[in-house]
């Protein structure tokens, strides 16, 4: 028995690398020293632009959104999701992304399918001046089923140590600015999938109340906030802290970016929760606490700032076609009049 008979096609793997080469190398900046194919990606760190350069790294996946995306042929979109989940994490430190690595594991290499994934990854990287420096595609018969794949991403960025954003400057009455999400992004899909399994008319029901395609809305790629954040920082606007709203929603992610003696007080009436979330809540009978602790509810990213910068940030976000608004403020934990992060039912 040869290797191909056992389920691993080496030649197909070589052909796949050849087919993705154009998309991958299209993301390369002048700091990439060699193209794909080596044992390690080589990247020249632009240290001349920094006094005390600090590398910031992040790794993530797309979770069980992949299950639905694969069944509906949203392969390009999950490639973008993979990049977004990593870049959105590292930019919370004020970092600029430098390069990205991907890992794709599958039961059987479907070149057409995975080419779309890599094209999505390349698109996400290219739009954010982030080089797709390398990756691994593993064909693993018997471990993954024939038509399934899993994704993991790894991103490295850079920031000057003196410009690190770590929440230490957060103070009482700072404003919390929300940046709108594209939708569900890449979290909560284990719950979403169970709701879909229990409601075989869910597409028709959603289209009836929204006049929108259910899966087009549900599987929109995660918004990448790098370009808008980069412009804000380039205009000498001080951001004291940032939070990427992912699994755990606002209640779990926002407190992570501020000192422990403060809490974020959120005005839950400051925005209208998008119809997709309200629909899922109703049709899935999701309890209020789970609703807030699972989904982003229309808020993909948060900034904590001094009030003097609010209008300038709104204008920059508008230039990037991103809705933004004041969602709350920072208060001390010992504040006797405001003792809850969110309404009591949520805490």
Curated annotation (Swiss-Prot):
Its EC number is 6.3.3.1. Pfam families: AIRS (PF00586), AIRS_C (PF02769). SUPFAM superfamilies: PurM C-terminal domain-like, PurM N-terminal domain-like. GO terms for molecular function: ATP binding; phosphoribosylamine-glycine ligase activity; phosphoribosylformylglycinamidine cyclo-ligase activity. Keywords: ATP-binding, Cytoplasm, Ligase, Nucleotide-binding, Purine biosynthesis. GO terms for cellular component: cytosol. It is found in: Cytoplasm. It comes from the Bacteria. Its main location: cytoplasm. Pathway: Purine metabolism; IMP biosynthesis via de novo pathway; 5-amino-1-(5-phospho-D-ribosyl)imidazole from N(2)-formyl-N(1)-(5-phospho-D-ribosyl)glycinamide: step 2/2. It catalyses: 2-formamido-N(1)-(5-O-phospho-beta-D-ribosyl)acetamidine + ATP = 5-amino-1-(5-phospho-beta-D-ribosyl)imidazole + ADP + phosphate + H(+). GO terms for biological process: 'de novo' IMP biosynthetic process; adenine biosynthetic process. Belongs to the AIR synthase family. NCBIfam families: purM. This is Phosphoribosylformylglycinamidine cyclo-ligase. It comes from Prochlorococcus marinus (strain MIT 9215). The gene is purM.
């Amino acid at each position: 028995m040869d290797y191909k008979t056992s389920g691993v096609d080496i030649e197909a793997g070589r052909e796949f690398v050849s087919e993705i080469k154009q998309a991958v190398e299209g993301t390369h900046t002048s700091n990439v020293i060699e193209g794909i194919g080596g044992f390690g990606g080589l990247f020249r760190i632009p240290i001349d632009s920094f006094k005390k350069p600090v590398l910031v790294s992040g790794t993530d996946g797309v979770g069980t959104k992949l299950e639905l995306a694969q069944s509906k042929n949203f392969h390009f979109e999950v490639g973008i999701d993979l990049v977004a989940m990593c870049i959105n994490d590292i930019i919370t430190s004020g970092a600029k992304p430098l390069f990205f690595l991907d890992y794709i594991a599958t039961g059987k290499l479907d070149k057409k399918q995975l080419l779309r994934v890599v094209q999505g990854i390349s698109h996400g990287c290219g739009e954010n001046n982030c080089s797709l420096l390398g990756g691994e595609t593993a064909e693993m018969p018997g471990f993954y089923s024939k038509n399934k794949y899993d994704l993991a991403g790894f991103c490295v960025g850079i920031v000057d140590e003196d410009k690190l954003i770590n929440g230490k400057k957060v103070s009482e009455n700072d404003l919390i600015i929300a940046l709108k999400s594209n939708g569900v992004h890449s979290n909560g899909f284990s719950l979403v999938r169970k709701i879909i399994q229990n409601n075989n008319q869910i597409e028709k029901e959603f289209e009836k109340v929204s006049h929108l395609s259910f899966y087009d809305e549900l599987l929109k790629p995660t918004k990448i906030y790098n370009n808008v954040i980069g412009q804000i920082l380039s205009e000498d606007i001080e951001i004291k802290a940032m939070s990427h709203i992912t699994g755990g929603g606002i209640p779990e992610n926002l407190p992570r970016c501020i000192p422990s003696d403060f809490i974020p007080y959120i005005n839950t009436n400051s925005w209208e929760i998008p119809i997709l979330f309200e629909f899922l809540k109703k049709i899935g009978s999701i309890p209020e606490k789970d609703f807030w602790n699972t989904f982003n509810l229309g808020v993909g990213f948060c900034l904590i700032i001094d009030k003097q910068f609010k209008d300038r940030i709104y204008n920059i976000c508008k230039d990037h076609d991103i809705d933004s608004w004041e969602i709350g403020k920072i208060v001390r934990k010992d504040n006797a009049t405001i003792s809850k992060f969110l309404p009591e039912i949520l805490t």
